[in-house]
From Swiss-Prot:
The lineage of its organism: Bacteria, Pseudomonadati, Campylobacterota, Epsilonproteobacteria, Campylobacterales. NCBIfam families: PRK00714.1-3, PRK00714.1-5. This is RNA pyrophosphohydrolase. Keywords: Hydrolase. Gene3D superfamilies: Nucleoside Triphosphate Pyrophosphohydrolase. A motif (Nudix box) lies at residues 42-63.
Length: 157
């Protein structure tokens, strides 16, 4: 059996500033794949901790890293790229991720064009509607991480 190679990555489940009064989560549509909605995420640079990568990636991707960290998923969680996407990600078979549950402090600080844009648009949607909107190959990971945050009492909706 071949050993799979996964790119180290962080991902953020961003709750709206109104959480826990509302249960809305931030998702963004990739600029390179129309209709591909996901959480902000990105690679961990050499020598960088997952937390440092989280703050850097949020600033790069959504223009702000003004967040409150609510929880961190305790383990790496991996997913494979669909076979038709592997060519985009060099020699990796997929990504292994550290997930953070965060609350955004200010919606008006979001700026998808602050750096090189990775997303074309964003929205806050009800958490219960999330899996219908997300690309299929990420649904199982999202389901698992959200279930953990709920079970542990970090996510109350």
């Amino acid at each position: 059996m071949l050993h799979k190679k996964y790119r180290p990555n962080v991902a953020a489940i961003i709750m709206s500033p109104d959480y826990p009064n509302t249960c809305e989560v931030f998702i963004a549509e990739r600029i390179d794949i129309e209709g591909a909605w996901q959480f902000p995420q990105g690679g961990i640079d050499e020598g960088e901790t997952p937390l440092e990568a989280l703050y850097r990636e949020l600033l790069e991707e959504i223009g702000t890293n003004e967040i409150e960290i609510l929880a961190q998923y305790p383990r790496w969680i991996a997913y494979d790229f669909p076979s038709n996407m592997e060519h985009k990600f060099y020699s990796f078979d997929g990504q292994k991720q550290r997930y953070f549950l965060v609350r955004l402090k200010h919606v008006n600080n979001i700026d998808l064009n602050k750096h090189t844009p990775e997303f074309r648009s964003y929205q806050f949607i009800q958490l219960k509607d999330l899996l219908k909107k997300i690309v299929p190959f990420k649904r199982q990971v999202y389901r698992q991480v959200i279930a953990y945050f709920r079970k542990e009492g970090y996510l109350g909706c």
